[in-house]
Amino acid sequence: MLRDKSLTYISLFSSAGVGCYGFHMEGYHCIATNEIIERRLAVQRYNGKCELPSGYIAGDITTPETKALIYDEIDKWKKKGNDRVDVVIATPPCQGISVINHKKNASDINRNSLVIESVEIVKAIKPRLFVFENVQAFQKTFCITKDDKIVRIGDFIRDVLGADYIITGKVINFMNYGSNSSRTRTLVIGVDKDYRNTFTPYDLLPAYRPEKTLRDVIGNGTFKALDWGEIQEDDFYHAFRTYDPEMRAWIHDLKEGESAFDNEDPLKRPHKVVDGMIVENIKKNRDKYTRQKWDRFIQCVHTRNDQLAAQNTVHPVEDRVFSIRELMEMMTIPHYFKWVDYSLDELNAMTDDQKRRIYKENEVNIRQCLGEAVPTEIMRQIAARIKEEFCKKRVTPTDINKIIAKYGLDDKETMNQFVADNPEALSLPELQRIVELCNAKREENAAYYTNKFIVNEIMDILPDFSKDEIWIL
Protein backbone atom coordinates (compact mmCIF):
# COMPACT_ATOMS: atom_id res chain seq x y z
CA MET A 1 0.00 0.00 0.00
CA LEU A 2 1.33 3.42 -0.96
CA ARG A 3 1.35 6.47 1.30
CA ASP A 4 -1.83 7.77 -0.33
CA LYS A 5 -3.52 4.43 0.58
CA SER A 6 -3.71 3.28 -3.05
CA LEU A 7 -3.17 -0.45 -3.49
CA THR A 8 -0.63 -2.50 -5.43
CA TYR A 9 -0.59 -5.91 -7.08
CA ILE A 10 1.52 -8.43 -8.97
CA SER A 11 0.09 -10.71 -11.68
CA LEU A 12 1.65 -14.08 -12.54
CA PHE A 13 0.87 -16.15 -15.69
CA SER A 14 -1.06 -13.09 -16.79
CA SER A 15 -1.48 -13.86 -20.53
CA ALA A 16 -2.96 -10.71 -22.15
CA GLY A 17 -3.96 -9.31 -18.76
CA VAL A 18 -7.70 -9.55 -19.40
CA GLY A 19 -8.55 -10.72 -15.88
CA CYS A 20 -6.21 -8.57 -13.84
CA TYR A 21 -7.27 -5.56 -15.92
CA GLY A 22 -10.11 -5.49 -13.40
CA PHE A 23 -7.57 -4.44 -10.76
CA HIS A 24 -6.31 -1.74 -13.11
CA MET A 25 -9.89 -0.49 -13.51
CA GLU A 26 -10.17 -0.16 -9.72
CA GLY A 27 -7.09 2.05 -9.53
CA TYR A 28 -4.53 -0.49 -8.32
CA HIS A 29 -0.87 -0.01 -9.29
CA CYS A 30 0.68 -2.98 -11.11
CA ILE A 31 4.16 -3.57 -9.69
CA ALA A 32 4.96 -6.43 -12.07
CA THR A 33 3.19 -8.69 -14.54
CA ASN A 34 4.77 -11.93 -15.74
CA GLU A 35 3.91 -13.84 -18.92
CA ILE A 36 6.16 -16.20 -20.86
CA ILE A 37 4.69 -15.45 -24.32
CA GLU A 38 5.80 -12.03 -25.55
CA ARG A 39 2.89 -11.41 -27.96
CA ARG A 40 0.45 -11.71 -25.05
CA LEU A 41 2.51 -9.50 -22.78
CA ALA A 42 2.50 -6.92 -25.59
CA VAL A 43 -1.28 -6.58 -25.20
CA GLN A 44 -0.73 -5.54 -21.59
CA ARG A 45 1.73 -2.88 -22.73
CA TYR A 46 -0.86 -1.49 -25.17
CA ASN A 47 -3.22 -1.04 -22.21
CA GLY A 48 -0.66 0.68 -19.98
CA LYS A 49 -1.05 -1.66 -17.03
CA CYS A 50 2.37 -0.97 -15.49
CA GLU A 51 3.65 2.50 -14.70
CA LEU A 52 7.28 1.37 -15.02
CA PRO A 53 8.35 -0.23 -18.34
CA SER A 54 10.43 -2.76 -16.40
CA GLY A 55 7.22 -4.06 -14.79
CA TYR A 56 6.40 -6.08 -17.92
CA ILE A 57 8.40 -9.27 -17.37
CA ALA A 58 8.56 -11.81 -20.20
CA GLY A 59 10.16 -15.02 -19.04
CA ASP A 60 9.94 -18.44 -17.45
CA ILE A 61 8.93 -17.97 -13.84
CA THR A 62 10.73 -21.16 -12.81
CA THR A 63 14.10 -19.50 -13.44
CA PRO A 64 15.94 -17.49 -10.77
CA GLU A 65 16.48 -14.70 -13.32
CA THR A 66 12.75 -14.11 -13.84
CA LYS A 67 12.02 -14.21 -10.12
CA ALA A 68 14.84 -11.73 -9.52
CA LEU A 69 13.23 -9.31 -11.99
CA ILE A 70 9.95 -9.51 -10.06
CA TYR A 71 11.69 -8.89 -6.73
CA ASP A 72 13.61 -5.96 -8.26
CA GLU A 73 10.30 -4.31 -9.16
CA ILE A 74 9.07 -4.74 -5.59
CA ASP A 75 12.21 -2.95 -4.37
CA LYS A 76 11.61 -0.10 -6.83
CA TRP A 77 8.11 0.38 -5.47
CA LYS A 78 9.36 0.33 -1.89
CA LYS A 79 11.39 3.41 -2.80
CA LYS A 80 8.15 4.97 -4.09
CA GLY A 81 6.59 4.46 -0.65
CA ASN A 82 4.93 1.04 -1.02
CA ASP A 83 5.08 -0.68 2.36
CA ARG A 84 4.02 -4.10 1.10
CA VAL A 85 2.55 -5.79 -1.97
CA ASP A 86 -1.20 -5.86 -1.39
CA VAL A 87 -2.29 -8.62 -3.78
CA VAL A 88 -0.62 -11.38 -5.80
CA ILE A 89 -2.81 -12.82 -8.57
CA ALA A 90 -1.81 -16.13 -10.16
CA THR A 91 -3.49 -18.22 -12.87
CA PRO A 92 -0.87 -20.95 -13.46
CA PRO A 93 -1.45 -23.54 -16.20
CA CYS A 94 -3.04 -26.61 -14.65
CA GLN A 95 -3.71 -29.89 -16.45
CA GLY A 96 -6.87 -31.27 -14.90
CA ILE A 97 -6.26 -34.81 -13.67
CA SER A 98 -8.85 -37.06 -12.08
CA VAL A 99 -7.85 -38.00 -8.55
CA ILE A 100 -8.91 -41.61 -9.08
CA ASN A 101 -7.72 -44.17 -11.64
CA HIS A 102 -6.18 -41.72 -14.05
CA LYS A 103 -2.74 -42.03 -15.56
CA LYS A 104 -0.49 -39.05 -15.01
CA ASN A 105 2.33 -38.31 -17.41
CA ALA A 106 5.44 -36.26 -16.76
CA SER A 107 4.32 -33.23 -18.77
CA ASP A 108 1.02 -33.01 -16.87
CA ILE A 109 2.77 -33.12 -13.52
CA ASN A 110 5.37 -30.57 -14.61
CA ARG A 111 2.64 -28.17 -15.79
CA ASN A 112 0.86 -28.56 -12.49
CA SER A 113 4.14 -27.89 -10.72
CA LEU A 114 3.96 -24.31 -11.98
CA VAL A 115 1.46 -23.98 -9.13
CA ILE A 116 4.38 -24.75 -6.80
CA GLU A 117 6.23 -21.76 -8.20
CA SER A 118 3.21 -19.51 -7.61
CA VAL A 119 2.86 -20.64 -4.00
CA GLU A 120 6.55 -20.21 -3.28
CA ILE A 121 6.55 -16.71 -4.76
CA VAL A 122 3.58 -15.78 -2.57
CA LYS A 123 5.49 -17.08 0.44
CA ALA A 124 8.55 -15.04 -0.53
CA ILE A 125 6.66 -11.81 -1.29
CA LYS A 126 4.27 -12.03 1.69
CA PRO A 127 1.43 -9.98 0.17
CA ARG A 128 -1.58 -8.98 2.22
CA LEU A 129 -3.75 -11.19 0.01
CA PHE A 130 -3.43 -13.67 -2.83
CA VAL A 131 -5.90 -14.85 -5.46
CA PHE A 132 -5.48 -18.07 -7.46
CA GLU A 133 -7.90 -18.78 -10.32
CA ASN A 134 -7.95 -22.10 -12.10
CA VAL A 135 -9.89 -25.12 -13.37
CA GLN A 136 -12.79 -26.64 -11.48
CA ALA A 137 -10.72 -29.57 -10.16
CA PHE A 138 -7.78 -27.33 -9.23
CA GLN A 139 -7.66 -28.12 -5.52
CA LYS A 140 -8.02 -31.88 -6.04
CA THR A 141 -5.46 -32.04 -8.84
CA PHE A 142 -2.01 -33.44 -8.13
CA CYS A 143 1.28 -31.59 -8.42
CA ILE A 144 4.87 -32.53 -7.64
CA THR A 145 6.76 -30.60 -4.96
CA LYS A 146 10.43 -29.65 -4.99
CA ASP A 147 11.20 -32.69 -2.82
CA ASP A 148 9.47 -35.00 -5.34
CA LYS A 149 6.27 -35.57 -3.38
CA ILE A 150 2.99 -35.82 -5.29
CA VAL A 151 0.29 -33.94 -3.40
CA ARG A 152 -3.07 -32.35 -4.06
CA ILE A 153 -2.74 -28.68 -4.95
CA GLY A 154 -5.28 -27.56 -2.36
CA ASP A 155 -3.40 -29.37 0.40
CA PHE A 156 -0.08 -27.94 -0.76
CA ILE A 157 -1.37 -24.36 -0.73
CA ARG A 158 -2.65 -24.75 2.83
CA ASP A 159 0.46 -26.59 4.05
CA VAL A 160 2.79 -23.85 2.79
CA LEU A 161 0.68 -20.74 3.37
CA GLY A 162 -1.87 -21.78 5.99
CA ALA A 163 0.19 -20.59 8.95
CA ASP A 164 0.08 -17.00 7.71
CA TYR A 165 -3.17 -16.79 5.75
CA ILE A 166 -6.87 -17.50 6.11
CA ILE A 167 -7.51 -19.55 2.95
CA THR A 168 -10.75 -20.38 1.18
CA GLY A 169 -11.26 -22.29 -2.06
CA LYS A 170 -14.59 -21.99 -3.83
CA VAL A 171 -15.85 -23.53 -7.09
CA ILE A 172 -18.29 -21.19 -8.83
CA ASN A 173 -19.75 -20.71 -12.28
CA PHE A 174 -18.66 -17.21 -13.25
CA MET A 175 -21.87 -16.59 -15.20
CA ASN A 176 -23.66 -16.29 -11.83
CA TYR A 177 -21.06 -13.93 -10.37
CA GLY A 178 -20.60 -11.18 -12.94
CA SER A 179 -19.42 -12.82 -16.15
CA ASN A 180 -21.71 -12.97 -19.19
CA SER A 181 -20.71 -16.53 -20.16
CA SER A 182 -20.54 -19.90 -18.44
CA ARG A 183 -17.18 -20.76 -16.93
CA THR A 184 -16.98 -23.07 -13.91
CA ARG A 185 -13.73 -22.32 -12.13
CA THR A 186 -12.00 -22.41 -8.76
CA LEU A 187 -11.10 -19.28 -6.82
CA VAL A 188 -8.64 -19.71 -3.95
CA ILE A 189 -8.28 -16.56 -1.87
CA GLY A 190 -5.88 -16.05 1.01
CA VAL A 191 -6.03 -13.16 3.50
CA ASP A 192 -3.24 -12.35 5.96
CA LYS A 193 -4.27 -13.47 9.45
CA ASP A 194 -3.59 -9.95 10.72
CA TYR A 195 -7.05 -9.19 9.31
CA ARG A 196 -8.73 -12.28 10.78
CA ASN A 197 -11.13 -10.27 12.96
CA THR A 198 -12.20 -7.84 10.25
CA PHE A 199 -12.60 -9.65 6.93
CA THR A 200 -12.05 -13.06 5.37
CA PRO A 201 -11.91 -14.53 1.84
CA TYR A 202 -15.69 -14.99 1.86
CA ASP A 203 -16.10 -11.21 2.09
CA LEU A 204 -14.11 -10.82 -1.13
CA LEU A 205 -15.92 -13.26 -3.41
CA PRO A 206 -17.95 -11.66 -6.23
CA ALA A 207 -21.68 -11.21 -5.69
CA TYR A 208 -24.25 -13.72 -6.98
CA ARG A 209 -26.54 -12.68 -9.82
CA PRO A 210 -28.80 -14.53 -12.27
CA GLU A 211 -27.10 -15.53 -15.50
CA LYS A 212 -27.77 -13.53 -18.66
CA THR A 213 -28.92 -14.95 -21.97
CA LEU A 214 -27.16 -14.56 -25.29
CA ARG A 215 -29.94 -12.18 -26.33
CA ASP A 216 -29.32 -10.03 -23.24
CA VAL A 217 -25.63 -9.69 -24.07
CA ILE A 218 -25.37 -9.38 -27.86
CA GLY A 219 -28.97 -9.50 -29.13
CA ASN A 220 -31.81 -7.02 -29.56
CA GLY A 221 -29.90 -5.00 -32.14
CA THR A 222 -26.82 -4.50 -29.98
CA PHE A 223 -24.61 -5.54 -32.89
CA LYS A 224 -25.00 -4.90 -36.59
CA ALA A 225 -25.63 -7.93 -38.83
CA LEU A 226 -22.54 -8.62 -40.93
CA ASP A 227 -22.12 -9.60 -44.55
CA TRP A 228 -19.44 -12.07 -45.66
CA GLY A 229 -16.01 -10.70 -44.69
CA GLU A 230 -17.40 -7.37 -43.48
CA ILE A 231 -15.60 -5.30 -40.85
CA GLN A 232 -18.00 -2.87 -39.20
CA GLU A 233 -17.06 0.65 -40.23
CA ASP A 234 -17.29 2.19 -36.76
CA ASP A 235 -16.08 -0.84 -34.76
CA PHE A 236 -12.98 -2.63 -36.01
CA TYR A 237 -13.47 -5.53 -33.61
CA HIS A 238 -16.93 -6.46 -34.92
CA ALA A 239 -16.13 -8.41 -38.08
CA PHE A 240 -17.23 -11.47 -40.08
CA ARG A 241 -14.45 -14.07 -39.92
CA THR A 242 -14.42 -15.88 -43.26
CA TYR A 243 -13.91 -19.60 -43.84
CA ASP A 244 -14.08 -22.09 -46.73
CA PRO A 245 -17.22 -20.94 -48.62
CA GLU A 246 -18.23 -24.57 -49.25
CA MET A 247 -18.85 -24.94 -45.52
CA ARG A 248 -21.49 -22.22 -45.49
CA ALA A 249 -24.16 -24.59 -46.79
CA TRP A 250 -23.56 -26.79 -43.76
CA ILE A 251 -24.89 -24.15 -41.34
CA HIS A 252 -26.99 -21.83 -43.52
CA ASP A 253 -30.37 -23.55 -43.03
CA LEU A 254 -29.91 -24.45 -39.38
CA LYS A 255 -32.28 -23.16 -36.73
CA GLU A 256 -31.21 -22.30 -33.19
CA GLY A 257 -29.86 -25.35 -31.37
CA GLU A 258 -29.50 -27.44 -34.54
CA SER A 259 -26.24 -29.03 -35.63
CA ALA A 260 -24.90 -29.38 -39.17
CA PHE A 261 -24.60 -33.09 -38.44
CA ASP A 262 -28.43 -33.19 -38.31
CA ASN A 263 -28.87 -32.10 -41.94
CA GLU A 264 -30.66 -34.73 -44.05
CA ASP A 265 -28.67 -33.87 -47.17
CA PRO A 266 -25.22 -35.52 -46.86
CA LEU A 267 -23.72 -32.63 -48.84
CA LYS A 268 -24.83 -30.30 -46.05
CA ARG A 269 -23.26 -32.40 -43.32
CA PRO A 270 -19.60 -31.75 -42.39
CA HIS A 271 -17.48 -33.82 -44.77
CA LYS A 272 -14.47 -33.95 -47.02
CA VAL A 273 -14.11 -35.37 -50.52
CA VAL A 274 -11.56 -38.16 -50.95
CA ASP A 275 -11.01 -39.61 -54.44
CA GLY A 276 -14.35 -38.19 -55.51
CA MET A 277 -16.17 -39.80 -52.58
CA ILE A 278 -17.88 -37.95 -49.71
CA VAL A 279 -16.34 -38.93 -46.36
CA GLU A 280 -18.35 -37.52 -43.47
CA ASN A 281 -16.55 -36.02 -40.50
CA ILE A 282 -16.78 -37.90 -37.24
CA LYS A 283 -19.32 -36.35 -34.88
CA LYS A 284 -17.33 -36.21 -31.65
CA ASN A 285 -19.23 -33.41 -29.94
CA ARG A 286 -22.86 -32.41 -30.29
CA ASP A 287 -22.03 -28.71 -29.91
CA LYS A 288 -19.76 -28.44 -32.98
CA TYR A 289 -21.25 -26.74 -36.07
CA THR A 290 -24.23 -25.90 -33.83
CA ARG A 291 -26.19 -22.67 -33.86
CA GLN A 292 -26.41 -21.16 -30.40
CA LYS A 293 -29.75 -20.27 -28.82
CA TRP A 294 -30.71 -16.68 -28.13
CA ASP A 295 -32.66 -17.34 -24.96
CA ARG A 296 -30.29 -19.52 -22.97
CA PHE A 297 -27.11 -18.75 -21.08
CA ILE A 298 -23.90 -18.28 -23.05
CA GLN A 299 -21.66 -21.31 -23.25
CA CYS A 300 -18.01 -21.18 -22.21
CA VAL A 301 -15.73 -19.27 -24.59
CA HIS A 302 -12.99 -21.65 -25.78
CA THR A 303 -9.60 -20.92 -27.32
CA ARG A 304 -10.64 -22.13 -30.80
CA ASN A 305 -13.56 -19.74 -31.02
CA ASP A 306 -12.40 -18.90 -34.56
CA GLN A 307 -13.70 -22.18 -36.02
CA LEU A 308 -17.17 -23.41 -36.94
CA ALA A 309 -15.96 -26.86 -35.91
CA ALA A 310 -15.15 -25.77 -32.36
CA GLN A 311 -17.60 -25.87 -29.48
CA ASN A 312 -20.49 -23.38 -29.30
CA THR A 313 -19.11 -20.88 -31.80
CA VAL A 314 -21.87 -20.42 -34.42
CA HIS A 315 -24.06 -17.29 -34.29
CA PRO A 316 -27.82 -17.93 -33.73
CA VAL A 317 -28.86 -16.49 -37.11
CA GLU A 318 -25.81 -15.37 -39.08
CA ASP A 319 -23.49 -17.75 -40.94
CA ARG A 320 -20.39 -17.01 -38.90
CA VAL A 321 -18.58 -17.45 -35.62
CA PHE A 322 -18.91 -14.75 -32.99
CA SER A 323 -16.90 -11.60 -33.61
CA ILE A 324 -14.11 -10.46 -31.28
CA ARG A 325 -16.35 -7.66 -30.00
CA GLU A 326 -19.15 -10.10 -29.21
CA LEU A 327 -16.69 -12.35 -27.38
CA MET A 328 -15.42 -9.35 -25.42
CA GLU A 329 -18.97 -8.69 -24.24
CA MET A 330 -19.31 -12.33 -23.20
CA MET A 331 -16.08 -12.03 -21.20
CA THR A 332 -17.03 -8.61 -19.73
CA ILE A 333 -13.98 -6.90 -21.23
CA PRO A 334 -14.30 -3.09 -21.42
CA HIS A 335 -15.07 -1.61 -24.83
CA TYR A 336 -11.89 0.50 -24.68
CA PHE A 337 -9.53 -2.46 -24.05
CA LYS A 338 -6.78 -2.46 -26.70
CA TRP A 339 -5.64 -5.64 -28.47
CA VAL A 340 -3.18 -3.89 -30.80
CA ASP A 341 -1.09 -0.74 -30.56
CA TYR A 342 -3.76 1.48 -32.12
CA SER A 343 -6.78 3.21 -30.64
CA LEU A 344 -10.22 2.18 -31.87
CA ASP A 345 -10.55 5.49 -33.71
CA GLU A 346 -7.25 4.86 -35.49
CA LEU A 347 -8.33 1.34 -36.46
CA ASN A 348 -11.71 2.50 -37.73
CA ALA A 349 -10.04 5.15 -39.91
CA MET A 350 -7.86 2.61 -41.74
CA THR A 351 -8.53 1.24 -45.21
CA ASP A 352 -10.05 -2.23 -45.56
CA ASP A 353 -6.70 -3.61 -46.71
CA GLN A 354 -4.96 -2.21 -43.64
CA LYS A 355 -7.65 -3.61 -41.37
CA ARG A 356 -7.40 -7.08 -42.92
CA ARG A 357 -3.63 -7.04 -42.53
CA ILE A 358 -3.97 -6.31 -38.83
CA TYR A 359 -6.56 -9.06 -38.49
CA LYS A 360 -4.26 -11.51 -40.25
CA GLU A 361 -1.39 -10.68 -37.89
CA ASN A 362 -3.35 -10.59 -34.63
CA GLU A 363 -6.72 -12.34 -34.75
CA VAL A 364 -5.62 -15.83 -33.69
CA ASN A 365 -3.67 -14.43 -30.74
CA ILE A 366 -6.62 -12.28 -29.67
CA ARG A 367 -9.09 -15.15 -29.87
CA GLN A 368 -6.79 -17.54 -27.98
CA CYS A 369 -6.33 -14.95 -25.24
CA LEU A 370 -10.10 -14.52 -25.01
CA GLY A 371 -10.57 -18.27 -24.59
CA GLU A 372 -7.98 -18.49 -21.82
CA ALA A 373 -8.94 -15.35 -19.93
CA VAL A 374 -10.50 -14.75 -16.55
CA PRO A 375 -13.56 -12.55 -17.18
CA THR A 376 -12.59 -8.98 -16.30
CA GLU A 377 -15.67 -8.33 -14.17
CA ILE A 378 -14.85 -11.23 -11.83
CA MET A 379 -11.47 -9.78 -10.93
CA ARG A 380 -12.83 -6.22 -10.87
CA GLN A 381 -15.36 -7.19 -8.22
CA ILE A 382 -12.69 -8.89 -6.10
CA ALA A 383 -10.46 -5.82 -6.45
CA ALA A 384 -13.34 -3.52 -5.46
CA ARG A 385 -14.18 -5.59 -2.39
CA ILE A 386 -10.56 -5.68 -1.25
CA LYS A 387 -10.35 -1.90 -1.64
CA GLU A 388 -13.61 -1.45 0.24
CA GLU A 389 -12.33 -3.52 3.17
CA PHE A 390 -9.10 -1.53 3.40
CA CYS A 391 -11.05 1.74 3.30
CA LYS A 392 -13.11 0.82 6.35
CA LYS A 393 -12.25 2.33 9.70
CA ARG A 394 -10.48 -0.13 12.02
CA VAL A 395 -10.51 0.18 15.81
CA THR A 396 -8.51 -1.54 18.54
CA PRO A 397 -9.99 -3.28 21.62
CA THR A 398 -9.02 -0.19 23.62
CA ASP A 399 -10.91 2.02 21.15
CA ILE A 400 -13.98 -0.22 21.48
CA ASN A 401 -14.00 0.17 25.27
CA LYS A 402 -13.74 3.96 24.88
CA ILE A 403 -16.68 3.96 22.43
CA ILE A 404 -18.81 1.93 24.86
CA ALA A 405 -18.08 4.42 27.65
CA LYS A 406 -18.53 7.49 25.41
CA TYR A 407 -22.01 6.52 24.22
CA GLY A 408 -23.21 4.74 27.38
CA LEU A 409 -23.89 1.54 25.48
CA ASP A 410 -24.65 -0.54 28.57
CA ASP A 411 -28.24 0.64 28.12
CA LYS A 412 -30.12 -1.64 25.72
CA GLU A 413 -32.14 1.07 23.97
CA THR A 414 -29.07 3.25 23.55
CA MET A 415 -27.22 0.27 22.12
CA ASN A 416 -29.99 -0.46 19.61
CA GLN A 417 -29.95 3.14 18.42
CA PHE A 418 -26.14 3.17 18.21
CA VAL A 419 -26.14 0.07 16.00
CA ALA A 420 -28.84 1.56 13.76
CA ASP A 421 -27.07 4.92 13.38
CA ASN A 422 -23.45 3.65 13.49
CA PRO A 423 -22.11 7.17 14.19
CA GLU A 424 -18.49 5.93 14.31
CA ALA A 425 -18.78 4.25 10.87
CA LEU A 426 -17.64 0.93 12.31
CA SER A 427 -17.44 -2.32 10.37
CA LEU A 428 -19.98 -5.08 11.04
CA PRO A 429 -17.53 -7.27 13.05
CA GLU A 430 -16.71 -4.31 15.31
CA LEU A 431 -20.40 -3.57 15.89
CA GLN A 432 -20.96 -7.23 16.71
CA ARG A 433 -18.06 -7.18 19.15
CA ILE A 434 -19.49 -4.11 20.92
CA VAL A 435 -22.91 -5.76 21.21
CA GLU A 436 -21.31 -8.83 22.76
CA LEU A 437 -19.29 -6.83 25.30
CA CYS A 438 -22.38 -4.86 26.32
CA ASN A 439 -24.49 -7.96 26.84
CA ALA A 440 -24.46 -8.45 30.60
CA LYS A 441 -25.98 -11.91 30.25
CA ARG A 442 -23.53 -13.24 27.66
CA GLU A 443 -22.00 -15.73 30.08
CA GLU A 444 -25.36 -16.92 31.34
CA ASN A 445 -26.71 -17.40 27.80
CA ALA A 446 -23.39 -18.28 26.11
CA ALA A 447 -24.08 -15.37 23.77
CA TYR A 448 -20.51 -14.89 22.63
CA TYR A 449 -19.37 -13.23 19.44
CA THR A 450 -17.90 -15.69 16.91
CA ASN A 451 -15.31 -13.90 14.82
CA LYS A 452 -15.16 -14.18 11.07
CA PHE A 453 -12.02 -16.30 11.09
CA ILE A 454 -13.79 -19.17 12.86
CA VAL A 455 -16.82 -18.91 10.57
CA ASN A 456 -14.53 -18.92 7.52
CA GLU A 457 -12.70 -22.04 8.72
CA ILE A 458 -16.00 -23.86 9.22
CA MET A 459 -17.31 -22.78 5.81
CA ASP A 460 -14.09 -23.84 4.10
CA ILE A 461 -14.38 -27.47 5.17
CA LEU A 462 -18.08 -27.83 4.38
CA PRO A 463 -18.95 -29.72 1.17
CA ASP A 464 -20.70 -27.94 -1.69
CA PHE A 465 -24.46 -28.40 -1.41
CA SER A 466 -26.67 -28.73 -4.48
CA LYS A 467 -30.00 -28.53 -2.59
CA ASP A 468 -31.74 -25.39 -1.34
CA GLU A 469 -32.42 -27.05 2.02
CA ILE A 470 -30.45 -29.63 4.00
CA TRP A 471 -31.02 -31.46 7.29
CA ILE A 472 -28.27 -31.24 9.90
CA LEU A 473 -28.33 -33.98 12.51
Predicted regions and their residues:
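Class I S-adenosyl-L-methionine
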Residues: M1-R3, S14-G17, D72-R84, C94-K288, K360, R367, A373-E388, R394, ...
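Core alpha/beta nucleotide-donor-binding catalytic domains of modification enzymes
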Residues: L2-I125, Q136-K140, I144-I150
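A detector of helix-start/N-cap boundary segments at the beginnings of structured domains
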Residues: Y9, V317, R442-A446
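Conserved proline-anchored active-site loop of SAM-dependent methyltransferases
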Residues: S11-C20, N82-N101, L129-V135, V188-D192, ...
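Short, solvent-exposed loop/turn segments at secondary-structure junctions
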Residues: G17, E38, P93-G96, Q136-A137, ...
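C-terminal target-recognition/interaction regions appended to catalytic cores
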Residues: R241-V395
